[in-house]
Amino acid sequence: MLVLNNFERIKIGLASPDQIRAWSHGEVKKPETINYRTLKPERDGLFCERIFGPTKDWECHCGKYKRVRYKGVVCDRCGVEVTRSKVRRERLGHIELAAPVSHIWYFKGIPSRMGLLLDMSPRSLEKVLYFVSYIVIDPGETPLLKKQLLTETEYREAREKYGNAFKAGMGAEAIKELLAEIDLDELSAELKAEIKESTGQRRIRALRRLEVVESFRKSGNRPEWMILDVIPVIPPELRPMVQLDGGRFATSDLNDLYRRVINRNNRLKRLLELGAPDIIVRNEKRMLQEAVDALIDNGRRGRPVTGPGNRPLKSLSDMLKGKQGRFRQNLLGKRVDYSGRSVIVVGPELKLHQCGLPKEMALELFKPFVMKKLVADGIAHNIKSAKRMVERVKPEVWDVLEEVIKEHPVLLNRAPTLHRLGIQAFEPVLVEGRAIQIHPLVCTAYNADFDGDQMAVHVPLSAEAQAEARLLMLSSHNILNPKDGKPVVVPTQDMVIGSYYLTVEKPGAKGEGKKFAHPEEVIMAYEEGVIELHTKIKVRYPIRGEIVELETTPGRIIFNEVIPEELRFINHLVDKKALGKIVTESYRKLGYEKTGYLLDGLKKLGFHYATKAGLTIGIVDITVPKEKQEILEEADRMVADIEVKYRRGLITEDERYQRVVDIWNAATEKVTKKLVETLEASQFNHVYMMAKSGARGNIQQIRQLAGMRGLMADPSGRIIDLPIKANFREGLTVLEYFISTHGARKGLADTALRTADSGYLTRRLVDVCQDVIVREEDCGTEDGIYVTDVKDGTDVIEKLEDRILGRVAAEDVVHPETGELLVAKNQEITEEIAEKIVSANIKKVKIRSVLTCRTRHGVCTRCYGRNLATNSIVDIGEAVGIIAAQSIGEPGTQLTMRTFHTGGVAGEDITQGLPRVEELFEARRPKGQAIITEIDGVVEVRDNKGRREIEVINQETGERKVYPITYQARIKVQTGDKVYAGDELTEGPINPHDLIKVKGIEGAQLYLLQEVQKVYRMQGVEINDKHIEVVIRQMLRKVKIEDSGDTDLLPGSLVDIFEFEDENAKVIAKGGKPATAKRVLLGITKASLATDSFLSAASFQETTRVLTEAAIKGKVDPLLGLKENVIIGKLIPAGTGMARYRNIMVQAKNEE
């Protein structure tokens, strides 16, 4: 495969004036743009054809040379080269400045790079640059100091006193001289010495200066290049000027900004030629400096330059920044052709891998293919007549379209694409009408419904793209959800209720207890009306070659007809969970092809019997339990009792509130329990059937319909202690209705906020993980992590079995009693092995983990284990980072925003839901954090003169630590308890940074993992550990240098672990002293910005800051991640984009 942009890495640096002149195709001398009469570009202006190239292909400005044959000729009259007009997108010009100006990025950024190099404060630097003060460049023999600032009067006095014995100046010229004088090597040596000697603020300042000096020294950039003598002018097509229909012109803001620079520059030139007084020239230079500032980064200093309507003009920096900037708008996401969108409707008769494509849409999308085929089949004589045929929609076109579309998959996508299942490939089937038809089973993956949702269609063009769509993206291949390995294509709603209805038993139905010799007899008896669908019968049934006698129902026999032979016989009530199990089982045993058939069978059967059952609900189905009244009266009595106690002052307001809430909660529970009993008695209650089968609705909703609504929360989230006693069947009173609107309104507001927060979290996660790719088979590490059940108090949140399944054992696991080898080291733990380990009562297993993987720039297959979407060990090249980010981000919207107010208990907020996940991943210091012990030992809790404290005493070493505790804090331990370093003494979240100090890296990793899991599990969302591990690994990949030893590393800087080890290895090999460092935990935003790739960081956040730093350091981007490669338009280095697939040619069979 020919790759045009086949380069290894990309470097950024400062441009020297000579470099800028070398890029340029000519100097822009005039501020004019185009001639208002001829509408042709003015010569030497911002759109000049002589500099930037012709506006029309192969045609010079004056029209002397027209046609391709003059290619490359430079016209002797107008000086325009005859060439393609698209060179106007790539040719730069330049402006020669009459006075140097500073580049605002380097003077104004934080920290000010210019200021650090010159050891001046940004304030004094600003005074010099904007012509407020003079600066002494060379004091000569005078008592003045170098870099001393002088006001106008002080300067005059000094001139009178010392004459020309000293040299001072103002503006960028003076700064340029100072910068040019700097000897970087000498300065670097001085600073290193100072760092060794000094302490405190001075050392920190020296460190920061050394960082900048080293950057310049290593990158080969010269400090004086931060001052501009010449400014590049970007190509005119990138700052276009277009005529609007009213004859007016719309132009890019950059043209205005360039015009101001050119105007001021030309005026300054004229003033200098005339020899104008100093003060006027100075003012003009200041204005030129401000104009250049506005061009580079408008609004960074002072008031932004505004256009018409007081709108700040968009400068070069703004062109890159933010969602609308170049990076995110045009480089990371582009609009594509061969795409369309339309409303979706359900297509129940489609197969799992098909979608219905409207005819006119298909014709438009596959137009070139149809035209080629028309010519090839001899229906049209040439491409032009073929095009005419397609445009006039001749009848023969449709037959050709049918052929073209066969075996050519299309991609369907629904926004928002929260995970990779939001884009899948289908085989198109032509349909009448203008709506896309979707298979009902893929709706869950897309989160689609048919209330007006729209979907986009894309056509993969090349043979390679088609092959990938068919082999990797076909919907029937994406049955399992990558986040937890559970099937995502499971029958829902009608299909569930159909299967449920079909497999229900009805005691005492017609013909109960009859015996049959063969399943076909049963069906016949049912069709003849001898027995019902739900009758209990006995039958001899052939299963895998042997005859078994079963007690079952005709419905279940019909249900088993769609089940593959290997999985029969399913002889129980089938609800949604059971369907999920059947699909999982089928996928594991029979692969996706047969599972596809099974799913289509279940779909057809479910719809059919849901229709036959005719399940309806009416107000009659909602039966209010008889006991409700008694329960309520009882509760009212208890509440009245408490009110009396409260009025007598026997209990506090808080206690009263808490008890009332508890009473009503208990009452609601009782009503619900009675309601369920009532419903279960009548097994065929339709409302209950829907909830029980998992088709729609849940017990909470039925409780509100037929039980009581219970307690509601007010806008702040506090529970109102006045319950809603009525249900929707009886109807609410006005007050009850009013109270319940609070909750509803808050719910809507929350959902809106949550969606945005969740999207932003996903974006940060993707950014931090995007370069985690499976790079090799085995990294050879001996490390691993020990896993046990994850518990919250005594409740098991995540079982050991789930945690070890599909992982690779890091050591042999042996049965504690029999000594039998259950799993060998480096062997995958399958379902069977996991079951054995649990049944052997082993509580702790050491597994390979991403957290301890030694692969650089990625992970290895052994440490990652099984790819959950395919149920087999992960392939090399899989972008597991992106999968992890999507798996954590996608359920984000389901997490509640609510900061729960535990009704009145010490009134403290526990952060939960999405904000808690964010707090963990951003490694923030949590609110109300727990106090943890730093040593192992025994606890003593005591009150000491009005303050509480906990002392931990280590019996072996005799070490003691005392922790003062506030009275608000809730203590978790008692005197005499044994604690270990890192255990909590009070309740609350732990600060992960403290945990690293006490328990080391591993402790912090496991804490973060368990805490994130807790939040998701509380909401009933299952996410596999390995996804969270990938993110935590990325948060911990940097070390902070403490002592640089003999290496080039700077103390206090953040360095990648592997880079740090490399540097040390080099130094040790030479017999030098290695550097020391400590691991740091970075939040995901910080970690994204600290990545090695400046392209990735710049496209994430703080674009200008990242680019400023990268340019000064002369950073090289090794293009290892996905984003960097997307930005420069290369194939991503994952999956089939890896080097090893580069030269494989895909050939379509049917063409030859």
Swiss-Prot record:
The gene is rpoC. It comes from Carboxydothermus hydrogenoformans (strain ATCC BAA-161 / DSM 6008 / Z-2901). Its EC number is 2.7.7.6. Zn(2+) 2 binds at C779, C853, C860, C863. It holds the Pfam family RNA_pol_Rpb1_3. Keywords: DNA-directed RNA polymerase, Magnesium, Metal-binding, Nucleotidyltransferase, Transcription, Transferase, Zinc. SMART domains: RPOLA_N. GO terms for cellular component: DNA-directed RNA polymerase complex. It catalyses: RNA(n) + a ribonucleoside 5'-triphosphate = RNA(n+1) + diphosphate. It comes from the Bacteria. GO terms for biological process: DNA-templated transcription. The RNAP catalytic core consists of 2 alpha, 1 beta, 1 beta' and 1 omega subunit. When a sigma factor is associated with the core the holoenzyme is formed, which can initiate transcription. Zn(2+) 1 binds at C60, C62, C75, C78. DNA-dependent RNA polymerase catalyzes the transcription of DNA into RNA using the four ribonucleoside triphosphates as substrates. This is DNA-directed RNA polymerase subunit beta'. The lineage of its organism: Bacteria, Bacillati, Bacillota, Clostridia, Thermoanaerobacterales.
